Amino acid sequence: MSRIGKNPIAIPAGVTVEVNNSIVTVKGKLGQLTQNYTNNVTVKVEEGQVIVERAADSKQERAQHGLYRALINNMVAGVSTGFTKELELVGVGYRASNQGQKLDLALGFSHNIVLEIASEVTLETISEKGKNPIVKLTSFDKQLLGQVAAKIRGFRKPEPYKGKGVKFVGEVLRRKAGKSA
């Protein structure tokens, strides 16, 4: 049995889970998420828990068993508590500001990068004197949050020599030694 898939998902107070025609719908105080699943797995709601089971024991079905259990668990956690990612802008003159859902990034290019953020993601920029600017993203949808954060990081990935670029807070960069004289 899948080590991840066999664990039931506890449903916290204030969260409802519905299963209809291979679609799981999770509703909570922060929002609503839906997920389709294949007929290789079955999803049941019993006694305040979500149980994911698989029909057979092939390699693909074992993988999907753990996958759908993890996706549903992320949905339940997202609508109850939410997820947060913080990006740090490391570099001279790197700045971030926001006007509503528009993120304005100055990352050393000739023009600023203006990015429209999805309405499901809340955006906050923190700029303190003497510290690197931080972009804080919060959402109930973990997949969308990771996609938006990866897109922002992709504008200027951290380089290995000086560490300049956009990185996640707490991310450890593999640094290289410069050329020796």
Swiss-Prot record:
<dbReference type="InterPro" id="IPR020040">
    <property type="entry name" value="Ribosomal_uL6_a/b-dom"/>
</dbReference>
<comment type="subunit">
    <text>Part of the 50S ribosomal subunit.</text>
</comment>
<dbReference type="InterPro" id="IPR000702">
    <property type="entry name" value="Ribosomal_uL6-like"/>
</dbReference>
<keyword id="KW-0699">rRNA-binding</keyword>
<comment type="similarity">
    <text>Belongs to the universal ribosomal protein uL6 family.</text>
</comment>
<dbReference type="InterPro" id="IPR019906">
    <property type="entry name" value="Ribosomal_uL6_bac-type"/>
</dbReference>
<protein>
    <recommendedName>
        <fullName>Large ribosomal subunit protein uL6</fullName>
    </recommendedName>
</protein>
<comment type="function">
    <text>This protein binds to the 23S rRNA, and is important in its secondary structure. It is located near the subunit interface in the base of the L7/L12 stalk, and near the tRNA binding site of the peptidyltransferase center.</text>
</comment>
<dbReference type="GO" id="GO:0003735">
    <property type="term" value="F:structural constituent of ribosome"/>
</dbReference>
<keyword id="KW-0689">Ribosomal protein</keyword>
<keyword id="KW-0694">RNA-binding</keyword>
<dbReference type="GO" id="GO:0022625">
    <property type="term" value="C:cytosolic large ribosomal subunit"/>
</dbReference>
<keyword id="KW-0687">Ribonucleoprotein</keyword>
<dbReference type="Pfam" id="PF00347">
    <property type="entry name" value="Ribosomal_L6"/>
</dbReference>
<dbReference type="InterPro" id="IPR036789">
    <property type="entry name" value="Ribosomal_uL6-like_a/b-dom_sf"/>
</dbReference>
<dbReference type="GO" id="GO:0002181">
    <property type="term" value="P:cytoplasmic translation"/>
</dbReference>
<dbReference type="InterPro" id="IPR002358">
    <property type="entry name" value="Ribosomal_uL6_CS"/>
</dbReference>
<dbReference type="GO" id="GO:0019843">
    <property type="term" value="F:rRNA binding"/>
</dbReference>
